[in-house]
UniProtKB/Swiss-Prot annotation:
Its cofactor is Ca(2+); Mg(2+). Substrate binds at G195, G196, D197, G198. The keyword Membrane applies. Residues 1-125 are annotated as: Required for binding to sulfatide and phosphoinositides. The gene is Cerk. This is Ceramide kinase. Keywords: ATP-binding, Calcium, Cell membrane, Cytoplasm, Kinase, Lipid metabolism, Magnesium, Membrane, Nucleotide-binding, Phosphoprotein, Transferase. It comes from Mus musculus. Catalyzes specifically the phosphorylation of ceramide to form ceramide 1-phosphate. Acts efficiently on natural and analog ceramides (C6, C8, C16 ceramides, and C8-dihydroceramide), to a lesser extent on C2-ceramide and C6-dihydroceramide, but not on other lipids, such as various sphingosines. Shows a greater preference for D-erythro isomer of ceramides. Binds phosphoinositides. GO terms for biological process: ceramide metabolic process. SUPFAM superfamilies: NAD kinase/diacylglycerol kinase-like.
Amino acid sequence: MGAMGAAEPLHSVLWVKRRRCAVSLEPARALLRWWRSPEPGPSAPGADARSVLVSEIIAVEEKDDCEKHASSGRWHKMENPFAFTVHRVKRVRHHRWKWARVTFWSADEQLCHLWLQTLRGLLESLTSRPKHLLVFINPFGGKGQGKRIYEKTVAPLFTLASITTEIIITEHANQAKETLYEINTDSYDGIVCVGGDGMFSEVLHGVIGRTQQSAGIDPNHPRAVLVPSTLRIGIIPAGSTDCVCYSTVGTNDAETSALHIIIGDSLAIDVSSVHYHNTLLRYSVSLLGYGFYGDLIKDSEKKRWMGLVRYDFSGLKTFLSHQYYEGTLSFLPAQHTVGSPRDNKPCRAGCFVCRQSKQQLEEEEKKALYGLENAEEMEEWQVTCGKFLAINATNMSCACPRSPGGLSPFAHLGDGSSDLILIRKCSRFNFLRFLIRHTNQEDQFDFTFVEVYRVKKFHFTSKHVEDEDNDSKEQEKQKFGKICKDRPSCTCSASRSSWNCDGEVMHSPAIEVRVHCQLVRLFARGIEEES
């Protein structure tokens, strides 16, 4: 809060909507309050008292002219009224925020000026607020409304908050990523992306890649310790999927996201690096899915002409195909975290699990640095293999309007782990039951064919790679293929799936995944508990 605690408390009687109100500002609590005060003297706040945290005030404006309100007789007795307007955050239902304002009036010009200067001084002391932002707008994503959403909803709020911007409307894929590699980002307080999860992924890769490049880190090395970026990323949802925004804010509302950016919220989230043969393939923050979700996204890419309905169509087609895939998974359980995938403790703003897990990881890193012990060598990898309908790794709940709980309702945003969900081969009916549970309050992990682990690393190799690496299995493969050929009704998987990496198709028969704890920061605070 900076110098906030040094300011003196203010108590005055002002007018709000033609009603006399007692108004107080308590810098120590960073709180502005007002309540009705029928009598001129001091009064205690009642049930009708309103308040706003100074940190959630957007701006304070001087009001020069007297608005033509339908006034009471008392109002007409006030000569030459002066006023100031406080623009603030107002919470509404379902985690949405709205811009609201309240105007305070007084006949005393000096009193109004004192309030104006005091509030502005407190706002200037909030050093976490951005002043200059670089904005990338995807005009093609979702329903093609990105530019309109920014101009109509976001830009006026940024102007009100005295935030200056440089805007780039992207014209081709990966333009945002390429731009962030090329330009000097030192003059910006953050990067804002207007679009869906694909647009966010571009900015994420650009920010992480540029940071590692500047630090001299080779991101292709699977064991490289990546350097966190100081640049925060803001997401204005305007895409076909807004999973990251929904999971970190609680809604996919553009105005809500803009207000989180304005007040300078900051939330550190985990990022997974995905490698194959010492080559970085991609980074992931939400879903890394093989099998069902991989096939779904691959099929939907061929049907972009269908618009958003392509996801429903491809989902139904993939479900009916009921394809399963064979492979081997090895994973390192996340011993450092205090939570588990089925503990009924969702990640919320100011999350205790994320704080404690981060501290525990830092302690482990210190011990390894001084050679006291290597936690990874002491922990045991677990190995499992079989036939899977889906393999999902989630760094967050992956919640969305259709699935408010998400793929893993109790996954955490910054605990340095990923929830690894294995859906083994089962009947089509049972798989449907599993999918339906994502839309209600029932436990989707409560099936014999579903396993879930909280991990910090995992490797996957498809059966095809294993067979290719082992020449001695060639005859067995031919025998396996002959059996399938002789029995057309056989549903054995003869192909390999693709990966769904945050909504993008990724082709790799084997991958190595590592979670990097709280690697990037967003203009968000996590989902708040609703009263």
